From Swiss-Prot:
Protein origin, superkingdom: Eukaryota
Keywords in alphabetical order: Cell membrane, Ion transport, Membrane, Transmembrane, Transmembrane helix, Transport
Source organism: Pongo abelii (Sumatran orangutan)
Gene Ontology BP terms: alpha-ketoglutarate transport; monoatomic ion transport; prostaglandin transport
Function summary: Functions as a Na(+)-independent bidirectional multispecific transporter. Contributes to the renal and hepatic elimination of endogenous organic compounds from the systemic circulation into the urine and bile, respectively. Capable of transporting a wide range of purine and pyrimidine nucleobases, nucleosides and nucleotides, with cGMP, 2'deoxyguanosine and GMP being the preferred substrates.
Region of interest: Disordered: 522-548
Protein's UniProt name: Solute carrier family 22 member 7
Catalytic activity: orotate(out) + L-glutamate(in) = orotate(in) + L-glutamate(out); 3',5'-cyclic GMP(in) = 3',5'-cyclic GMP(out); GMP(in) = GMP(out); 2'-deoxyguanosine(in) = 2'-deoxyguanosine(out)
Amino acid sequence: MGFEELLEQVGGFGPFQLRNVALLALPRVLLPLHFLLPIFLAAVPAHRCALPGAPANFSHQDVWLEAHLPREPDGTLSSCLRFAYPQALPNTTLGEERQSRGELEDEPATVPCSQGWEYDRSEFSSTIATESQWDLVCEQKGLNRAASTFFFAGVLVGAVAFGYLSDRFGRRRLLLVAYVSTLVLGLASAASVSYVMFAITRTLTGSALAGFTIIVMPLELEWLDVEHRTVAGVLSSTFWTGGMMLLALVGYLIRDWRWLLLAVTLPCAPGILSLWWVPESARWLLTQGHVKEAHRYLLHCARLNGRPVCEDSLSQEAVSKVAAGERVVRRPSYLDLFRTPRLRHISLCCVVVWFGVNFSYYGLSLDVSGLGLNVYQTQLLFGAVELPSKLLVYLSVRYAGRRLTQAGTLLGTALAFGTRLLVSSDMKSWSTVLAVMGKAFSEAAFTTAYLFTSELYPTVLRQTGMGLTALVGRLGGSLAPLAALLDGVWLSLPKLTYGGIALLAAGTALLLPETRQAQLPETIQDVERKSAPTSLQEEEMPMKQVQN
C-alpha cells in the first residue's frame, strides 16, 4: 500500500484540505503585494531641476521655466538638465544679462541639476525616487531599477535555501521562518535611513518571501488526491490575483512609500498565528520516517473529512509499512535533480520555462506606463484580467493537458509583446488591449508552471526541484527590470527581448512529459520508469493512472 491509498482512506479532498487552502491563502496574497510593490514604491513622478528664486506669481512661472530649462525632442521641458545661464526669450526681460554680454547661442550650454529636483506630488506624496537625499532620477535612475533587481536576487538566493531546507527540516517549520523573517525585515525596510540600508533589507526580504513561493503550493498538493489537484491549484492561485487587485487599492489609499511598505508587511503577524492550524505534509513525514507524527495528521484528516477509520488499514503499524517504502535514506541535494536521465531532462526544461515565465511576466507587470491609464487603474485592470485567465487555465489543463497549456500561454505572451511592436505609441487604446492580453497569457503561464512543476518532481525531491525552478525564475525576475533599460539602445528592444524569451520557453515546454491524470511520483524511480518524450503526442507520467 502506498501513500495514495492512505490518502484515499482519510479523504483526498474535503474540509481538511479546504481549510488547508484557506490557511495558506495569506502567503499567496502577500506575494504580489511585495513582488509588484515597486510599481508604487519606486514610481518616478514628473520632475525638473530645482530652481531657487522662482517667481511667486504663478502667471510668470511658465516664462521662468522656459528661460531656465531646455526642451526635449518631444517638446516637454527637460527633467534632468537646465541651462547654464538663463535664456533671453522674445518679449521678456529674462536673460538680459547674457544678452548684454553677447553670450546668446543657437544651442545654449546645459548642465545637470545641481540643486536637487522638484517633484509633482499630485499622484505620489513620496516614493524612494523622491526621498530626500536619495533622488533616484536622471543619472541615479539605474539605482531605482536596481532596487527591484536586488529584491529578486534575494528571492533567488532564498529559493535555494528554502528549497533545500524544507526538504530536510519540513515545510511547516520553514514556512514559520519565512513569516517571521518577512515581518522583521519588512519593518526594517520601512525604517531605512539610507538607500544602502533599504537595498540590503529589501534583498533580505526577498530571500524570506522565497519561502512562500516554493512551500505553499507543494504543501497544499501533497494533501490532495489526483482528481482535485487542478481545481485546488487554480483556486489557490486566485489569491495571487486578489493580492494584485488589493495592491491597487492599498497603493491608491496610501501614497507614502514607508507607510505603504508597513501596510503590506504587517499582515505577516496574523499569518504566524495561523500556522498553529496548518498541518505538516504527511508525505514528507513518511519519507523522513516520522511515522507517529504522520499517523496523527492522517487521523486528524480522517476526522475532519468525516471518514470512518479502519483500525487495520490506518493503524500505526500499517502506516509504518508505507513509510518503509517511502523513506529517504539520504538527504536530497540539487545534484540529485541531474543524476538520472529523465530527471535531468525535466530539470533542464523547467529551468528554461521558469526563466521565460518570470522574465516576461515581470517585464510586463512592472511596466504600467504608456497605456493611457493612471498607475492605479492599470494595476487594477492587470489584476482583474487574471481572473478569466484562471478559468482558461482550469479548463485547458484538464482537457488539453499541462504541457500544451504551458506552451500555448507562453506563445500567447510572446505574440502580445510582438504585436505591441507594430502598434504606434500614439495608439493608446490598442497598446492597452495588447498589454492586457499579454498580462492574461503571462499570468496563465505562471499558474500553469506552479501546478505543472509540482507534479513533475517526486516527493523526495519536490521542494528541491521547486527551489531550483524558483531560483532560475527569480533570476529572470531580477533581470526583467534591468532589461527595461535597453530602451536607451533601441526603444523596442525591451519588448523584443521579453517576447523572444517567452517564445523560447514555449518551445521548451513542449519537451516536458504530460502529467494530466497521473498520480504524484513518490521516488526518483517512479520518474525514471519511462524515457523522456520525443514527440508531441500526449504521454502520461509513468505512475498509476486514474480516470477523470
